[in-house]
Amino acid sequence: MLVEEAHRRDGRLDLVFNNAGIGVGGAVEDLTLSHWERAIDVNLRGVVHGVAAAYPVMLRQGHGHIVNTASVAGLIPAPFITPYSMTKHAVVGLSLSLRGEAAAHGVRVSALCPGTVDTAILDRGNPEDLPDVRTLDGREYVTRVAGAPYSADALATDVLRGVQLNRAVIVAPRRARMAWRLHLAAPWIVEQMNLRNVAWARERYGLSPVVAVDTSP
């Protein structure tokens, strides 16, 4: 196993980044169970496997830091990427709960919650082997919702600073931190923003338009 091999080679394991993640999205009514299962298998189980490999080693040596990559979508609701958002919320919960257990053993745990980062995930869409559903143009949608994507190099600098400071939740860039704080302070404002973005996306991408239902007797 990679973790054990690194520990044998170097005699210590100081820092582990669990960075598994794929984008899975679309209107929930269009998704199949396979969409949900794939998101869970990669985005959540991938992190669980990383923790299961690294945590025992760090317990034995009495130090180390595990950084689990979630997303700002793990702190704030994210319509039309609901499976992704769900799994990233789970990664935050895993990280903060484990952090409470690990502290007494000298092991640190952080949840990394970046905003939109300029990587290939913005252009990939759903995995090609899953049933085809209408989904978003990731790059266009997130730019509208969250502003221009953040460079991976700038994120790396912010992450290492957060690790050095032992932050429980590392949120970057600044606009992502502001969005999170707004959600904590005034969640109804974020909800209204989400509703507007959902209406725009339904029209823009043809995502399961709302059909009026006749409820008259």
Predicted regions mapped to residue ranges:
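Active-site helix of classical SDR
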Residues: V51, T87
